[in-house]
Regions:
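Asp-based phosphoryl-transfer active-site loop
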Residues: 2-17
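Conserved acidic, metal-coordinating active-site core of Asp-based
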Residues: 95-204, 208-216, 225
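Active-site phosphate-binding/coordination module
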Residues: 16, 21-115
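Asp-based, Mg2+/Mn2+-dependent phosphohydrolase catalytic module
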Residues: 216, 221-259
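Residue-level signal for inorganic ion chemistry
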Residues: 30, 41, 144, 214, ...
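Short, structured coil segments at secondary-structure junctions
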Residues: 55-56, 64, 159-163, 216-217, ...
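Active-site metal-binding loops of divalent metal-dependent hydrolases
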Residues: 11, 43, 205-207
Length: 259
């Protein structure tokens, strides 16, 4: 019996600002049947708040699993050590890189004029971050995007790469999370809190940062627009986002399992 359904956001529930009406209907049907919907995303709580409120979803696992929020309030967080962020800011300042830092209430950027950040804005769409001046201390940070190449990335992670969860999503941009946190780890913590077993959960995704997530639950579902690597690991492959993939999977594989 499925008791919880976790949804990646970009490429799964929505494509930029477009979200199919069928996805809204599917989430509403899950709630009507007592199944807990959860957003599970690499974005910050700050960024996904409008979507969470629009869909009436209480729980969100954000920052690729490093932050868990309930109705926008931090319930659990796994932040970077302050010294790590301090060192990375010094490296970025010296090398001319830009850091996008995810806090619980806001996002912060070290250089707003960075061309890579501006390209990411055009391609993906970030909510506007607050500028963080070199002399300002950063708050608790749950995820860091570094706009740099793969070789330059090693200046930040050094010999301690195993301490971080690293997801490179462009040749010039990489997500880094503390203590090996990923979406699966964050969802597992939430499942424990709600006393739901992994086999009683479903998860939807389309990207490589959803790989651990869909393998960690009883019903892992890859979107039709996902890559082959994710599809090979999924229990089911649904239709694409633009072809009502969420509703199709909910009606075919989740609601029948919740009876």
């Amino acid at each position: 019996m499925i008791k919880l359904a976790a949804f990646d956001v970009d490429g799964t529930l929505r494509d930029r600002e477009y979200m199919p009406e069928s996805a809204r209907r599917a989430v509403a049907r899950l709630k009507a049947r007592g199944i807990v919907p959860v957003l599970c995303t690499g974005r910050s709580e700050y960024e996904i708040r409008p979507l969470r409120e629009e869909l009436g979803i209480d729980w969100a696992v954000t920052c690729n699993g490093s932050h868990i929020g309930f109705c926008g309030r931090t319930e659990s967080g796994n932040a970077f050590a302050e010294e790590t962020i301090r060192e990375w800011r010094q490296i970025a300042e010296r090398r001319g890189h830009t850091l996008l830092l995810y806090g619980s209430e806001n996002m912060y950027i070290t250089r707003q004029a960075d061309p890579y950040f501006q390209q990411a804005q055009r391609e993906i769409g970030f909510m506007e971050p607050l500028p963080l001046n070199p002399e300002e201390e950063a708050p608790a940070i749950y995820q860091c995007i570094i706009f740099c190449g793969e070789e330059e990335e090693r200046e930040y992670t050094g010999k301690n790469r195993q301490k971080f969860y690293i997801h490179r999503w462009r040749t010039w941009a990489v997500d880094i999370n503390p203590n090996g946190r990923n979406k699966a780890e964050g969802l597992r913590e939430l499942l424990d809190r709600l006393e739901i077993r992994p086999e009683e959960a479903a998860a939807f995704g389309d990207g490589l940062n959803d790989l651990e997530l869909i393998e960690s639950v009883g019903t892992g579902i890859a979107m039709g627009n996902a890559g082959d690597e994710l599809k090979e690991k999924a229990r089911y492959v649904t239709r694409s986002l633009h072809d009502d993939g969420i509703e199709y999977a909910v009606d075919r594989w989740i609601l029948p399992e919740s009876r």
